[in-house]
């Protein structure tokens, strides 16, 4: 099998692990920077070019597209899809997951429980928005934030109004969410591949913070989850059309709440904490999908 990993940096842990896992199973792997690709878009002979040469066919593509390169990265991935390459996560699914507002709307439409979330444009609606999510304390999140960046805990109503006014002053799109106090600065990351949860970790915020992201200095440990949590994680990934996803769940009194679904979950923290070879599981999933394709 000939594989392409779409990544801006082939030295990153997740990219290295995927490359090593694929090579260990006898596959040829190229790491391709999507921003160095350019495309010929036509119905007769579409093509992808990379650093001055036309790329040959790849059986499958593993997208490791960062948030800052979503628009161009998914355009390149669409071109690979048009040329017949199997995408581990399809471009449309990645685009859905990267739009926090759209993804929450899709999850809610599927009946998946979420933290109460508000969204508004007019400053006149700020008071109602705060009340809608249960008042302070509450969380204000940039729609385009990632890895805990652009996430603020407002502990009082006045603080919430100030944060919302500041984000509006920056012309930034943001969400307002209830603060789930009983989660205690912890969340559960479920790594979903296909219709299975293959690894689970509980992430803890560092002292003095409420964000549990490992990139923000949080820690992680392997945990077990309930059947309800497992079902919610699988349902959330499927609702966005993702074959591989990191589903982040808050453990609330009323049950598991999906906080976010990550279309390009990092492997370092969850492989270390769970002691699972997730990279190889991703490669074997691709092998099975390609085998299904060829048997049709």
Swiss-Prot record:
GO annotation terms (biological process): protein modification process; SOS response; translation
Residues where Mn(2+) 1 binds: 248, 260
Stored Pfam families: RimK (PF08443), Rimk_N (PF18030)
Stretches assigned to the ATP-grasp domain: 104-287
InterPro entries: ATP-grasp, ATP-grasp_RimK-type, ATP_grasp_subdomain_1, RimK, Rimk_N, Rp_bS6_RimK/Lys_biosynth_LsyX
Entry EC number(s): 6.3.2.-
Binding site for Mg(2+) 2: 260, 262
Source species: Sodalis glossinidius (strain morsitans)
Gene3D superfamilies: 3.40.50.20, ATP-grasp fold, A domain (3.30.1490.20), ATP-grasp fold, B domain (3.30.470.20)
Positions that bind ATP: 141, 178-179, 187, 211-213
Protein name: Probable alpha-L-glutamate ligase
Cofactor dependence: Mg(2+); Mn(2+)
HAMAP family: RimK (MF_01552)
Gene Ontology CC: cytoplasm
Highest taxon above the source species: Bacteria
SUPFAM superfamilies found in the cross-reference section: Glutathione synthetase ATP-binding domain-like (SSF56059)
GO molecular-function terms, A-Z: ATP binding; metal ion binding; ribosomal S6-glutamic acid ligase activity
Family under the similarity heading: Belongs to the RimK family.
The record's free-text note on cofactor binding: Binds 2 magnesium or manganese ions per subunit.
Residues that bind Mg(2+) 1: 248, 260
UniProt keyword terms in alphabetical order: ATP-binding, Ligase, Magnesium, Manganese, Metal-binding, Nucleotide-binding, Protein biosynthesis
Residues annotated to bind Mn(2+) 2: 260, 262
């Amino acid at each position: 099998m000939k594989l392409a990993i779409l990544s801006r940096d082939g030295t990153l842990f997740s990219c290295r692990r995927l490359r090593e896992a694929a090579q260990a199973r006898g596959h040829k792997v190229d790491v391709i920077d999507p921003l160095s690709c350019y495309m010929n878009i036509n119905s007769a002979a579409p093509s992808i070019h990379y650093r001055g040469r036309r790329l040959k066919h790849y059986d499958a593509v593993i997208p490791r597209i960062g948030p800052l390169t979503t628009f161009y990265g998914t355009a390149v991935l669409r071109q690979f899809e048009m040329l017949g390459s199997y995408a581990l996560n399809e471009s449309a699914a990645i685009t859905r997951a990267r739009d926090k507002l759209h993804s929450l709307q899709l999850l809610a439409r599927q009946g998946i429980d979420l933290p109460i979330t508000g969204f508004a444009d007019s400053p006149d609606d700020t008071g109602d928005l705060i009340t809608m999510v249960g008042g302070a304390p509450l969380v204000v999140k940039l729609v385009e934030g990632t890895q805990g960046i652009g996430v603020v805990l407002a502990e009082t109503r006045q603080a919430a109004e100030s944060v919302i006014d500041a984000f509006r002053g920056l012309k930034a799109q943001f969400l307002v969410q209830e603060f789930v106090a009983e989660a205690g600065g912890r969340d559960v990351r479920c790594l979903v591949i296909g219709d299975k949860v293959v690894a689970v970790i509980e992430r803890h915020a560092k002292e003095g913070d409420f964000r549990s992201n490992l990139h923000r200095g949080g820690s992680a440990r392997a945990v077990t989850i309930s059947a309800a949590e497992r079902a919610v994680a699988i349902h959330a990934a499927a609702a966005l059309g993702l074959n591989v996803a990191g589903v982040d769940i808050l453990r609330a009194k009323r049950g598991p709440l999906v906080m976010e679904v990550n279309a390009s979950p990092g492997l370092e923290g969850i492989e270390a904490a769970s002691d699972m070879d997730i990279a190889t599981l991703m490669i074997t999933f691709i092998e099975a999908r390609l085998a299904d394709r060829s048997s049709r």
